[in-house]
Regions:
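Long, contiguous internal "core" modules enriched in hydrophobic/ aromatic residues
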Residues: 128-207, 231
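A cytosolic-side transmembrane-helix exit/cap motif
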Residues: 62-70, 119-132, 211-214, 232-246
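Membrane-interface helix-loop-helix junctions at boundaries between adjacent transmembrane segments
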Residues: 72, 89-164
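Hydrophobic core segments of alpha-helical transmembrane domains in multi-pass membrane proteins
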Residues: 43-54, 101-111, 165-173, 212-224
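Short, hydrophobic transmembrane alpha-helix segments
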Residues: 30-44
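C-terminal transmembrane-bundle signature of multipass membrane proteins
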Residues: 199-243, 250-263
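N-terminal membrane topogenic signal
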Residues: 3-23
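Central hydrophobic cores of alpha-helical transmembrane segments in multi-pass inner-membrane proteins
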Residues: 46-65, 113-117
């Protein structure tokens, strides 16, 4: 067995709770729905307000950072025109082709979330063989959950009588896949990262409304994104501050010290 990767984004425990295995968030969401069914919309709103919207807004510092202005200016099609076109097409699709738009949105959302899950695995990878296994497992199960979502809510072929059998099959499939993976690589933390990436859309198999299938598991995606974005933002601020300190030096002496000597 190869040595396990010791990379840490923040520290061992923060990484585990918010990036590698943020399972607490969908559990809290599910328990809240079960114990407070009359407040379903409030629970959805709170989840979206506290995690989803900050996750969407976390992208904006990219456009506000002066260091990125040249990149944005040189690639206007990617960073300006395409987002505007997507917004307009989304508005048109939502009002005039709602069913197709929702299906397309579901597919893009799953692809985006799956890509991030694989990216998280790359951050903590121990070796290429393990990463290849993680990629195949994550993409496979998320593709299965996408098909289940279509067959449950878009083309309702899977009815309530089949839900129990479906979940038994999925649970056994996940269990044996994870078991084989763990015995092969024996890396507990990467094993938990794999579980996170593989089960994000598992709620689509048992929730009664598609919104819960999207929000419940994807809360883990939101926390991962926010944690990583904060780290990038914090590192960027640190680098900018270091540059300012270096620029504030005069013949190797900080300006403040120089002024004190002069006075």
């Amino acid at each position: 067995m190869e040595a396990q990767n010791k990379l840490q984004i923040f520290n061992k425990y923060f990484d585990l709770i918010f990036i590698k295995f943020p399972i607490a968030f969908p559990i809290i969401y599910g328990v809240a729905l079960y114990t407070l069914p009359g407040y379903e919309n409030v629970i959805i709103f709170i989840a979206l307000l506290t995690l989803a919207e900050p996750h969407f807004g976390a992208t904006w510092p990219f456009f506000l950072d002066k260091g990125n202005f040249a990149e944005i200016k040189n690639r206007k099609i990617r960073y300006i025109y395409m987002p505007i076109a997507i917004i307009l097409l989304s508005l048109i699709g939502f009002f005039y082709a709602n069913s197709f738009f929702l299906l397309f949105f579901f597919a893009i959302n799953m692809f985006h979330v799956t890509r991030q899950s694989y990216g998280i695995c790359k951050l903590y990878k121990s070796n290429e063989q393990e990463l290849n296994y993680q990629e195949k497992i994550i993409y496979f199960f998320n593709a299965v959950f996408f098909i289940v979502g279509i067959l449950r809510f878009y083309i309702p072929i899977i009815d309530q009588t089949s839900i129990f059998k479906l979940n038994i099959i999925m649970l056994f499939s996940l269990f044996f896949t994870f078991l084989l993976y763990y015995f092969k690589f024996k890396n507990l933390e990467n094993f938990l990262t794999l579980i996170t990436g593989s089960i994000i859309f598992f709620p689509i198999c048992f929730v009664d409304k598609p919104i819960h299938g999207i929000v419940m598991g994807v809360l883990m995606h939101y926390t991962q994104y926010l944690a990583l974005t904060y780290k990038v933002y914090d590192k960027r601020n640190y680098n900018n501050l270091s540059k300012q300190v270096n620029n504030a030096k005069f013949f190797g002496i900080k300006n403040s010290t120089f002024l004190i000597i002069v006075l």
